[in-house]
From Swiss-Prot:
GO molecular function: structural constituent of ribosome
One Gene Ontology cellular component: cytosolic large ribosomal subunit
Family assignment from sequence similarity: Belongs to the bacterial ribosomal protein bL33 family.
BP terms from Gene Ontology: translation
Record keywords: Ribonucleoprotein, Ribosomal protein
Name under which the protein is recorded: Large ribosomal subunit protein bL33
Pfam families on file: Ribosomal_L33
Organism: Bartonella tribocorum (strain CIP 105476 / IBS 506)
Gene transcribed to yield this protein: rpmG
Amino acid sequence: MAKAATIKIKLLSTADTGFFYVTKKNSRTMTDKMSKRKYDPVVKKHVEFKETKIK
């Protein structure tokens, strides 16, 4: 069997609230760390979310 191309990642808020989103990415085409600007309901603002490992 082949290795799966998509992996699950955790997008953690840079506002240090502990809020995170879980999403998936294609590890073959996106080799660098993902970062997205999304809504953090704890601070009620759009902030940068950076990729971390799921433990």
